[in-house]
Amino acid sequence: VVIVSGYFDPLHVGHLEYFQMASQLGDKLLVIVNNDEQAKLKKGESFMNEKDRMEIIYALECVDEVLISCDTDASVCKSLELVIQFKPMADLIFAKGGDRNFGEVPEVDVCEKFGIQMVDSLGEKIRSSSEYTGLKQI
């Protein structure tokens, strides 16, 4: 199972390419969508609410499962631990997009603790969602 995460607020072609590349790394693709509270921490408000982002992503052909993050900070550490509880026998891969590498994400410790394989810099950053919305990171 390949796991990816992000705000996807709004979803754009760079995200779609990220999902497609990640889905090729394993049998199933699970997308963790950062929740509305996390979006407020990042940008002060979200462009699209978590439910709408989740529904759009779930409709994509390359996506098998979608989970709204249960975390209260900017990470998805608790959400990854939740996935481990529900998929204890699965070989898990946590893949980050081209705009992130594991030197700058807090999920590294959880991945190392539970033996989750990590793949970073998947694809390249084409455009920021903030360019579409006008909302800037705070």
What is each PLM-predicted segment?
Residues 1-138:
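Nucleotidyltransferase catalytic core that binds NTPs
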